[in-house]
Amino acid sequence: MLKVNKYVILIIAFVSQMMFSTTAQASFSATVSDAWSTLSNNVTQTWQAPEHYDLYVPVITWHARFAYDQEKIDNYNERPWGAGFGMSRWDEKGNWNGLYLMAFKDSFNKWEPIVGYGWEKTWRPLADDNFHLGLGYTLGVTARDNWNYIPLPVILPMASVGYGPATFQMTYIPGTYNNGNVYFAWLRFQF
């Protein structure tokens, strides 16, 4: 009798795990599907009905000093000369959506293009609605000289502070020792 109970318990445990796993999988699939739908709708709406056209001006790259040998720091470019163009809109929740194309001088002083989509949750904490803060992400594709200009996908965090049509946007490229760990910022002017 005791052996039968062990088998019954094992079967019940196995079946319940399978049921839970199937439910969790369905929930995860629905979440991914909803996220993809939201992203593609935001990109499409920004492309088809932009409120603004944007000028991008890269202003700084900074290599985290704790993550690099001094010799590398001394040889890196931290003035990312370049420019970019984009289109953007504020959605019904007041959040920023933008499509952009930018080219700038990378750490090795070689041209690096990037094209992508950015989204920021936007807060207007002051009585003056012109002042805004943002926190979000960017998805895009870049290409670098040291990777033979092979297209590389990027998913990066993004933050901003702005007043009216001028916004200081930034990201951080994570990495390992002597690779990545770069703060990159640019000015964005809306027209």
From Swiss-Prot:
Keyword entries, A-Z: Acyltransferase, Cell outer membrane, Membrane, Signal, Transferase
Biological process terms in GO annotation: lipid A biosynthetic process
Site (Role in lipopolysaccharide recognition): 72
Signal peptide limits: 1-26
Role in the phospholipid gating, annotated site positions: 177
Catalytic residue list: 63, 106, 107
One Gene Ontology term, aspect cellular component: cell outer membrane
Reaction catalysed by this enzyme: a lipid A + a 1,2-diacyl-sn-glycero-3-phosphocholine = a hepta-acyl lipid A + a 2-acyl-sn-glycero-3-phosphocholine; a lipid IVA + a 1,2-diacyl-sn-glycero-3-phosphocholine = a lipid IVB + a 2-acyl-sn-glycero-3-phosphocholine; a lipid IIA + a 1,2-diacyl-sn-glycero-3-phosphocholine = a lipid IIB + a 2-acyl-sn-glycero-3-phosphocholine
MF GO annotations: acyltransferase activity
Keyword set includes Mitochondrion: no
Protein origin, superkingdom: Bacteria
Compartment annotation: Cell outer membrane
Enzyme class: transferase
A Pfam family assignment: PagP
Predominant place of localization: membrane
EC number(s) recorded for this UniProt protein: 2.3.1.251
Functional note: Transfers a fatty acid residue from the sn-1 position of a phospholipid to the N-linked hydroxyfatty acid chain on the proximal unit of lipid A or its precursors.
HAMAP family for this protein: PagP_transferase
Summary of subunit composition and partner proteins: Homodimer.
Family stated for the protein in its record: Belongs to the lipid A palmitoyltransferase family.
Protein name: Lipid A acyltransferase PagP
Record organism: Enterobacter lignolyticus (strain SCF1)
Organism phylogeny: Bacteria, Pseudomonadati, Pseudomonadota, Gammaproteobacteria, Enterobacterales
Gene: pagP
